[in-house]
Amino acid sequence: MERLKLGKIPEHWCIRLVAMLLLAIIFLPSTFCDIGSVYNSSYETVIPERLPGKGGKDPGGKVSYMLLMQGQKQLLHLEVKGHYPENNFPVYSYHNGILRQEMPLLSQDCHYEGYMEGVPGSFVSVNICSGLRGVLIKEETSYGIEPMLSSKNFEHVLYTMEHQPVVSCSVTPKDSPGDTSHPPRSRKPDDLLVLTDWWSHTKYVEMFVVVNHQRFQMWGSNINETVQAVMDIIALANSFTRGINTEVVLVGLEIWTEGDPIEVPVDLQTTLRNFNFWRQEKLVGRVRHDVAHLIVGHRPGENEGQAFLRGACSGEFAAAVEAFHHEDVLLFAALMAHELGHNLGIQHDHPTCTCGPKHFCLMGEKIGKDSGFSNCSSDHFLRFLHDHRGVCLLDEPGRQSRMRRAANCGNGVVEDLEQCDCGSDCDKSQCCDENCKLKGNSVCSTELCCFKCNFKKEGDVCRPADGPCDLEEYCNGTSAACPSDRKAQDGSKCHESFLCFNGQCMDPTFQCSRIFGHGSRSASDYCYTSLNSRGDQFGNCGSSSQFPKKYTKCSDKNVMCGKLICTEVAFLPQIQPNNLLLQVPETEDWCWSVAVFDMRDSLHEEYVKDNTYCGKDKVCKNSICEDFTPFSFPCSPSKQCNKHGVCNDLGNCHCSFGFAPPDCKEEGTGGSVDSGPAVNLSNDSSPGPNSTQSSTEELILNLKLIVLAVILVLMILLIIICIISAYTKSETASEAGPSELEELPEGEKEEQEEVLPEEAKGEEEELEYGKEEAEEQGAVEEEGAEEANEEAAAEKKDEDEEEGEE
C-alpha cells in the first residue's frame, strides 16, 4: 500500500514550479552599476547653428556651424569629403541563418571635415546628416559630439574623450607574405622618378569591413546604426591615411547579426588567422577587395590590433583585425589606419623616425589619436609600391564597381528582389525554382519560420535557447522571418555563482565540455593550484609574444584565471600534431590541460575566459582575479519584470510562461516584445490563411503532464478498489476457511484462494468416496453378522430339538 500513495500526483507540478522558480532566481541580478564607461570627463549641451552662405546662397560642398563650446563661441568651417556616393556598397547580414544583402537607408554627402576658426591645429570630422556626429580636436583635446535623440531644439551632447589615450600593436605575424627584415635597397634614378610619380597620385584602398556579433550588439543590434558607425570610422581613418596620399574606400560591409561564424578568442593573432581562413573561403569571389578588416567588440589580450604585413592586394593575406571595446571612435580610427599601414608594408617606427609636431607617430607600437605617418612610414610605403605589391591601389574605383551588385541568382544568397535562392540544389527544393522565384502557392523557402513552403504557426519556436544565457524566439505566423537572436542581459546570474556575458554563461565547465566533450567539467582548486603555479605551457597566467615563449606563473589569487584545467574526461579530442595534452593524477581523478601551438586547432580556448567567477565578488580579467563591480541596467527582473521574467540584451522583459510582455504583470503566454509571441490563445474567428491557433512545446508538455496525472489518478483509484475488494473477500473467506489462511499475507491469500477450489474439490470427492465405501463395508459386515447370528440360532435350535427327542 505504501507504494501507491496519492502524493505522487502533484509531484510533476511541484517539479515544474520549482524549475520555473529556479530559472527566475538564476537570472535575478544583483544591484548593478556601470563598469564600462568610456568617458571620464565633462559633458555639456550645445546647439549647433548652421550659418547661411554668403548672400544666402548654398556654397555647394561647404558649410559652417556656430556653437557655444565651454562658454566660447566657436566657428566650424567644413567641407564635404569623399568622391563617391557613400551608400553605394553592399551590406550583408544574416537572417534566420541565411546571408542577405541589406539596403540601409543612408544619406549621401554626409561626411564633412574642417577646422575651427582661429584655433591653430584644430580638426573637425563630423557626419552632418540628422545632426552633427563625430570628433572635434581643439588644443590637443578630443571632443565627441552627437545629437540628443529626444531633443526638439537640435540639442547635442559635447563631451571630452580622455579615456585610453593610446593603444598598442605587437609585431605582426611571421607567416605574412613578406619578410619584415628586408634591408634598405639602393635606388636607381629611374626608380626615384617612378616613385615620385606614384607618390603624386592618390592611392585607393578598397576595404571590406566585417563587424562581429559582439560589436554589433554594442551598436544596439541595429543594422543602420552599425553601417553609419562604420562609415564614420572610415571617414576618420581617411584623415590619417591622407598623410600618405591614400584614401580608404568602403566597398562592402558584412555584419554578423546572429553570432560569429568563426572563433573569436581574446588572442587577436588567433582571431586574425581564423578570420583570414573565413575571408578566403566565404568572401573572395563575392566582393572584390584590396583588404578586409574585422572589427571585434571584446577587450583583447596584450594588443588591440593584428594585421598581415604587406598583405594588401594579395589573395592570401589581405586581412587585419581590430578590437573596438570602447566608444572612442577617433582612437579606433587611428588603430584601423595603423593596421592598414601594416597591410601596406609599413613597419613599426623606430626612435629616429619623425612625424612633425605629432606626439605619437601613427606606426609606433603605441598609437594615439593625435598621430600621423612618419618619414619612415613613407619610405616603407614607397618600397611596397616599388616592389609592385600595391598595383591594385593605383586603380581609381569607378562608380560601377562601387554600386551594389545586381542579384546573382544561384549563389545561395537572397539578394535585392529575389524571393529565394536555392543555389545549386534547386532540383531538391520544393519551394524555390532555378529563377529564384517561389513555386506555386509557396510563400517562403528556407527561412526559420518556414515549414513545407508555408509560414510556421504563431508561437512555434524558431530559435531555441542555446544555454542558460540565451532566450527563445518565436514565429508570428505571418512571416517567415525569425526575430533577431536575443540573449540574457549581461551580468545576469547563471549556474548559481557565474554570470552571463554576450549570451554565454561564464562557467569554465562549458569550456571543458567544448574541448573534452560531455561529462567533463572544470577541475578542483587543487588542480588549478598545482598546474597554474608551474609557469610552463601547461599551467600559467599568460605568455610573451616572443619566441621562445616565456610563461608567467599564477599567483595564489590568480590560479583560477590562468590555464583551463578540466577533469572527469572520458573522451580525448583530435588535435593537431604540434599540440599537447597533459594529465596529472589527483586524489580521485586526473587534472587535464592543453598546450596549443597550432592556432587552427579547435582547442585554442585554453585559458579561463574573462568575467569568469574566481572568488566572492571577483571575476577573471586577462588572467587576473579582480574585484567585480556590478553593472547598472535600466531593466531589473524584480522591478520591470515583476519577478516573472528576465531582462534581455535590449533591456526588455522576457516573460515566463503564464505572464505577458512587456512587464510580465498580466496573464499571458510568455515571450517578449523582441522575441515574438510565445503562443496564441486568442479566439479570433477569422485567422489568416497561414496564421492558425497553435500551442508551443511548453503548452504541449503541460497538457501531457495533465493527461498523465489524470491517468495515474484513475489507475491508483482502480488499484485501490481492487485491493479493497480483494481484502474484503479474503476477510470473508478467513471466517469460513481454515485458520492457516488468516496467517498468510494478502498476496499469498489471493493465490491460496485461487488454488483452494480445485484442491478442495478433489479432497471432497475422495472423502465422499471413502465414506460411501465405509458405509457399504459396514453394511456388508452388519449383514454378515446377522446371517451368522441367524445360523447360530438355528444350530442351537436344532441341538435343543435333538436333546428333547432323546
UniProtKB/Swiss-Prot annotation:
Domain Peptidase M12B stretches: 203-397
Composition skew (Acidic residues), residue ranges: 740-806
Primary localization class, coarse: membrane
Stretches the record annotates as Disordered: 169-188, 668-694, 735-806
GO terms (BP aspect): proteolysis; spermatogenesis
Disulfides per UniProt: 313-392, 353-376, 355-361, 462-482, 635-647, 641-653, 655-664
Glycosylation sites: 224, 375, 476, 680, 683, 690
SUPFAM superfamilies xref list: Blood coagulation inhibitor (disintegrin) (SSF57552), Metalloproteases ('zincins'), catalytic domain (SSF55486)
Tissue expression as described in the entry: Testis.
Membrane disposition: Single-pass type I membrane protein
TM regions (residue ranges): 705-725
Signal peptide: 1-33
GO cellular component, one term: membrane
Keywords: Disulfide bond, EGF-like domain, Glycoprotein, Hydrolase, Membrane, Metal-binding, Metalloprotease, Protease, Signal, Transmembrane, Transmembrane helix, Zinc
Record: active site: 339
Keyword Acyltransferase listed: no
Record's subcellular location: Membrane
InterPro entries in the record: ADAM_Cys-rich (IPR006586), Disintegrin_dom (IPR001762), Disintegrin_dom_sf (IPR036436), EGF-like_dom (IPR000742), MetalloPept_cat_dom_sf (IPR024079), Peptidase_M12B (IPR001590), Reprolysin_adamalysin (IPR034027)
Residues that bind Zn(2+): 338, 342, 348
Stretches assigned to the Cytoplasmic side: 726-806
Domain EGF-like: 631-665
E.C. numbers: 3.4.24.-
Role played: May play a role in spermatogenesis and sperm maturation.
Name of the protein described by the UniProt record: Disintegrin and metalloproteinase domain-containing protein 1b
Organism (species): Mus musculus (Mouse)
Gene from which the chain derives: Adam1b
